[in-house]
């Protein structure tokens, strides 16, 4: 399949959250292993006015990659237990990223099962922490370009608007009224968590992207 180029990522974050649905995420590891997942669920985060976004108070050493250029990975450690992956959007200098919330396993499923400790394909990538574990993504991929030979996206037809579901984002306690979670309606691979704030015992952690 043809790889997506730089122009694809230079669009408004909310639009990118929709356009990413159906696209194929590829991780080509140094070992030669290749894992692929079809994106079925995303969430948009914007630095301007979105208090659930890591960049809403400005640039820091931690979030600087969110300010561009677009088409790079923003990886962070969440709630002390999971690495989450975001794709940087917008024009350079404007903070924005799309959280990859869930995928459908496509290739390298045996390695995903080994990493995740389950043979249930629907559970391999049905959450943002699950998919990074399945794909083998971690802190080493912070700032990784999606135009290189390690991680990239492959083209796939856009999902028709009538098949795109929308809801509030999951696991956040601020800016909860924004309907910036996008997903392929009816997909058995989307996350099962209900929109809304995280459980009280997890409030010491960081918000999603």
Curated annotation (Swiss-Prot):
**What UniProt keywords apply to this chain's record, in alphabetical order?**
DNA damage, DNA repair, Hydrolase
Q: Which Pfam families match?
A: Pur_DNA_glyco
A GO BP entry is: base-excision repair
* Presence of keyword DNA damage: yes
Spell out the InterPro entries in the cross-references.
Formyl_transferase-like_C_sf (IPR011034), MPG (IPR003180), MPG_sf (IPR036995)
Specify where the region named Disordered lies, as residue ranges: 189-209
EC assignment: the record states 3.2.2.-
Top enzyme class, one word, equals hydrolase
Q: Ranges of Basic residues compositional bias? A: 199-209
Gene3D superfamilies in the record, alphabetically? Methylpurine-DNA glycosylase (MPG)
Q: What SUPFAM superfamilies does its record include?
A: FMT C-terminal domain-like (SSF50486)
The entry's family comment says: Belongs to the DNA glycosylase MPG family.
Q: What is this protein called?
A: Putative 3-methyladenine DNA glycosylase
Q: Which organism is it from?
A: Chlorobaculum tepidum (strain ATCC 49652 / DSM 12025 / NBRC 103806 / TLS)
Cite the source lineage: Bacteria, Pseudomonadati, Chlorobiota, Chlorobiia, Chlorobiales
């Amino acid at each position: 399949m043809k790889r997506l180029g730089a122009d694809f990522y230079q669009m408004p974050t909310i639009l990118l959250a929709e356009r990413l649905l159906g696209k194929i995420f590829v991780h080509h590891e140094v070992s030669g292993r290749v894992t692929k997942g079809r994106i079925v669920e995303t969430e948009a985060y914007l630095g301007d006015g979105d208090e659930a976004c890591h960049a809403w108070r400005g640039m820091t050493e931690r979030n600087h990659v969110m300010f561009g250029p677009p088409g790079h990975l923003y990886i962070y450690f969440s709630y002390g237990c999971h690495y989450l992956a975001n794709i940087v959007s917008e024009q350079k200098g404007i903070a924005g990223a799309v959280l990859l919330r869930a995928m459908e396993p496509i290739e390298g499923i045996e390695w995903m099962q080994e990493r995740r400790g389950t043979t249930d394909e629907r559970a391999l990538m049905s959450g943002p922490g699950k998919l990074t574990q399945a794909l083998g993504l971690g802190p080493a991929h912070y700032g990784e370009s999606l135009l290189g030979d390690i991680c990239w996206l492959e083209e796939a037809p856009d999902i028709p608007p009538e098949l795109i579901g929308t809801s509030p984002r999951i696991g956040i306690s601020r800016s909860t009224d924004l309907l910036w979670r996008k997903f392929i309606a009816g997909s058995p691979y989307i996350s099962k968590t209900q929109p809304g704030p995280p459980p009280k015992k997890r409030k010491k952690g960081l918000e999603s992207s």
